[in-house]
């Protein structure tokens, strides 16, 4: 990794290693001026944003090659810090030389703050069951139950949007009015108080018996009248 950074009195820090185990990193410093600067390799737990003077700073100037060795344990991180009384640009190049391999596997970009803290990696997607089928789901989703509830809410909202229209309410009001009319006006007794009798002709009354049962031509027949 190679990076040119403006170094001032507030330290800028680089993560040397954040993987558990021993490490060896070569740091090449190439300042743009002959002004002195300071460097230190230490653990992150000893490097804070309020007090830097208690760190074992090394004073130097010009080009410099530093080999930083250490062992990462307990989740701590090793950092390489730079500061300069007179602000200057310094090119920083780092190589991970663990096991003789030259790479920048453990090296991270510098920070704009007192020390660099890379963001944590995003959690992997969880595997949930959707109606018996396994599939990858988003982190904020809790699975099939949440998805089903969301669908029900969407369907209910669509139904309410359809029902909540003036023409629909007009139709519902007309239907309710018709049912009330049928129940209270078409089924109530007429002319006999509360006796329960309805205003419908009875078929076996003497007044209507002959004329109702047979046509008028039969009632005028003498044989029919005599037989009655």
Curated annotation (Swiss-Prot):
A single GO cellular-component term from the record reads: membrane
Residues covered by region (Disordered): 106-125
Q: How does it sit in the membrane?
A: Single-pass membrane protein
Query: Which of UniProt's keywords are assigned here?
Result: Glycoprotein, Membrane, Transmembrane, Transmembrane helix
Subcellular location, record wording: Membrane
Stretches that traverse the bilayer: 167-186
Protein's name according to its UniProt entry: Uncharacterized protein ORF43
């Amino acid at each position: 990794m190679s990076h040119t950074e403006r170094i001032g009195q507030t330290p800028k820090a680089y993560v040397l290693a954040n993987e558990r185990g021993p490490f060896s990193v070569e740091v090449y410093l190439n300042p743009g001026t002959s002004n002195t600067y300071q460097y230190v390799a230490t653990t992150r737990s000893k490097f804070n944003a309020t007090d830097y003077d208690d760190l074992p700073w090394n004073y130097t100037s010009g080009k410099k090659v530093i080999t930083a060795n250490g062992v990462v344990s307990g989740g701590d991180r090793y950092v390489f810090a730079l500061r300069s009384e007179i602000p200057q640009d310094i090119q920083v190049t780092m190589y991970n030389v663990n096991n003789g391999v030259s790479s920048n596997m453990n090296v991270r970009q510098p920070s704009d703050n007192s020390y660099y803290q890379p963001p944590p990696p995003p959690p992997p997607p969880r595997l949930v069951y959707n109606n018996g089928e396994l599939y990858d789901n988003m982190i904020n989703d809790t699975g099939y139950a949440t998805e089903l509830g969301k669908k029900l809410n969407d369907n209910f909202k669509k139904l309410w949007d359809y029902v909540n229209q003036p023409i629909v309410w007009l139709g519902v009001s007309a239907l309710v009015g018709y049912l009330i009319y049928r129940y209270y006006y078409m089924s109530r007794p007429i002319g006999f108080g509360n006796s329960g009798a309805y205003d419908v002709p009875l078929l076996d009354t003497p007044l209507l018996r002959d004329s109702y049962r047979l046509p008028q031509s039969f009632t005028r027949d003498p044989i029919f009248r005599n037989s009655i």
